Amino acid sequence: NAIRKSSASEMINIAVGSRRFRVTIETEGGHSYNAFGNRNAIAYMASMIDALYTIKPPTGTSYNVGVIQGGTSVNTIAQKAEMLYEFRSDRMDAMEQMQAHFDACVSFYRQKGVRIEVEVLGERPCTGDVDAVEQQKMMDKANQAYQDYFGCEAQFGSGSTDCNIPLSRGIPSLCLACYNG
């Protein structure tokens, strides 16, 4: 069979977008005894992560710091720390709200004189302004074909698939039976 049932939603009709960043903080650091009181990149990074986690995300939105690293030894005030941060949503306004919160956190720490570099690692768009009537027509046709083939109703849901690009540009799209995870 070219089409198979998957354990997730069989038809993806809503695109979940994501933005991913590497954030690097650099400070003067120094020896933990002789330079005590110097700024610690890890402490600033921990504080920034705490600030990022203060937002109550909109419905259908998530965020995560998945990796953090930094420092060189137990007796060295960390000069550098990095984290990988992402947020995801199936709504454009929520993506912009999350971006504004991220930008505000970065700006706050830059104003403290901390050197911060932000590298965009990836950006996948979410659903844009899709004509609801045309999208529904496509879903109805696909659902009928699904019923004819499998003998049951299709399950519609959201996910990150090849449909992200057309859906983000307002083009009605579906991803059929090839999404798992």
Short names for language-model regions:
Residues 1-128, 157:
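Midchain, well-structured core segments that form catalytic/ion-binding scaffolds
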Residues 23, 45, 142, 165-166:
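Structural element of the ATP-grasp superfamily
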Residues 57, 147-151:
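Residue-level recognition of short, structured coil/turn motifs
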Residues 68, 152-181:
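Zn-dependent metallopeptidase/amidohydrolase metal-coordination segment
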Residues 96, 133, 153-154:
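Residue-level marker of alpha-helix boundaries and capping positions
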Residues 106, 143-144, 163-164:
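Short glycine-/small-residue-rich flexible loop motifs, especially phosphate/cofactor-binding loops
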Residues 110, 147, 167:
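Anion (oxyanion) recognition and catalysis
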Residues 127-145:
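Short, low-order "capping/linker" segments at domain edges
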